[in-house]
Regions:
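Glycan-recognition and catalytic cores of secretory/periplasmic carbohydrate-active enzymes
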Residues: 22-24, 50-80, 91-93, 99-106, ...
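Positively charged n-region of N-terminal signal peptides that target proteins for export
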Residues: 1-5
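Bacterial N-terminal signal peptides
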Residues: 6-17
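Contiguous beta-strand segments within globular domains
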Residues: 24-46
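Interdomain boundary/hinge segments at the C-termini of tandem beta-sandwich modules
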Residues: 110-112
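Exposed aromatic-hydrophobic patches
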Residues: 41, 80-88
Length: 406
């Protein structure tokens, strides 16, 4: 039997055209509060005219409400038809799906407790990123860190900087990002302490220890920052560098050789206040204040957070907050991170926001008005620059504004 090419093509086209376009309904997977706006999105790869949609109770299969008010939206990606499905006026608690024709949404809940546990859920990522001991692996890593570099007198000396968090899917560690994460967690706990539970212990393993899990995570970060600032005027900015980027590996299997032997320790970059390596070039470090300010604000707020749980450590942190602040004041400028293989770094371009937040936080912790006055002055120096995730600008402005008018 012989078939013409044109016949085969026509047959394939007919077959493909008979396959219906993909359609989806996207919902808030956490669910919806009864009194809150409730919107889902219908999307289709083909042309679709949606005129109505229904809300179905999952356990009975009953249609509990019909809607005839879909709002057509712009196309999105390969989705040729997009509609917003508003069902805000339905407030009965329960478990439901939305249906458009034969297309069903995933099930979702309407109820007053849909957000319970979401604050703690975020901490799963922080525990996953832990260095020193990783509760997800239930194994230790990087226990030999590290060797000092860029110090005027201590290059190659050992320093104990275990702990903290890995920055991303690599295993580098930076004060730039870790201090930000620590402060953000403290700020969140300070504003809403009641939303955090106690399900894990201090090591991130299952089992309550009488301390909110977010405070356990905060202390994990503060312990590391404390090690990275072991004495007055001695600050370190990062552990390891992009020589780490040699394939995917679990933290416990990181055996990169930085010059001291495989897996025997990683470089710990001293805050020298001077340019350091950036691939074939040098970074644009001009001082220490951007890092010192981060230390100071974290230590000052950390003293407030930990005083009810670890009072001795809280006392130490408040002393170190003052020391870090004055070290930054005496060494103005930005302290950028370093890289060896490529030119990609955290390109810190501002330091006054860090010092402003540090001054405000020290004012809150000590009540000394001189710190508030200095915070206002740092705010006046603030350049108009783009907000980035590792800068404390928004927090420093907000806190300074809050206290300056009291």
């Amino acid at each position: 039997m012989k078939y013409s090419i044109s016949g085969i093509i026509i047959g394939l086209v007919s077959l493909l055209s008979s396959v219906s376009a993909g359609e989806w309904i996207r919902i808030n997977q956490l669910g919806y509060l009864p009194e809150s706006p409730k919107v889902a999105v219908f999307m289709s790869e083909g042309k679709a005219a949606v005129e109505e949609y229904v809300l179905v109770e999952v356990f009975t299969g009953e249609i509990v409400k019909w809607f005839d008010n879909p709002k057509k939206a712009n196309t999105w990606g390969r989705m040729q038809s997009v509609y917003r499905l508003d069902f805000s006026d339905f407030k009965t608690e329960g478990t439901y799906v939305l249906r458009v024709g034969e297309t069903m949404s995933p099930r979702f809940v309407i109820g007053n407790r849909v957000y319970d546990g979401t604050a703690d859920f975020i901490l799963r990522y922080m525990r996953q990123q832990r260095c020193g001991f990783n509760p997800f692996e239930r194994d230790s890593c990087h226990i030999h860190d590290g060797y000092i570099v860029y110090h005027p007198t201590r290059n190659g000396k050992r320093i104990d900087v275990r702990g903290g968090w890995h920055d991303a899917s690599d295993q580098l560690q930076y004060v730039t990002t870790s201090a930000n994460a620590t402060y953000q967690m403290m700020f969140a706990y300070l504003k809403n302490p009641e939303v955090y539970g106690d399900v894990y212990d201090a090591y991130g393993l299952p089992g309550a220890n009488g301390i909110p899990d977010i405070v356990d995570e905060i202390k994990w970060g503060l312990d590391w920052l404390n090690r990275m600032n072991p004495s007055k005027g001695e600050m370190y900015n990062q552990i390891a560098d992009d020589r780490d980027h040699k394939g995917f590996k679990l933290p416990s299997q990181d055996h990169i050789d930085y010059g001291w032997g495989k897996g025997t320790g990683r470089p710990v970059y001293y805050c020298s206040g001077k340019p350091q390596v950036r691939g074939e070039f040098s970074n644009a470090t001009t001082g220490v204040a951007s890092t010192a300010g981060k230390y100071a604000s974290c230590f000052a707020l950390g003293a407030e957070i930990l005083k009810d749980f670890y009072p001795d450590m809280a006392d130490i942190l408040l002393v170190k907050a003052r020391e870090a602040y004055w070290h930054g004041a005496n060494n103005p400028g930005v302290c950028q991170t370093a890289s060896v293989v490529s030119p990609y770094i955290y390109e810190e371009c501002n330091w006054t926001d860090d010092m402003e937040l540090a001054a405000v936080q020290l004012y809150v912790s000590t009540g000394e008005t001189s710190f508030l006055q200095e915070a206002v002055e740092y705010g006046r120096f603030e350049p108009v620059t783009m907000v980035s995730f590792y800068q404390f600008r928004a927090l420093s402005f907000g806190e300074c504004e809050r206290f300056a008018h009291k």
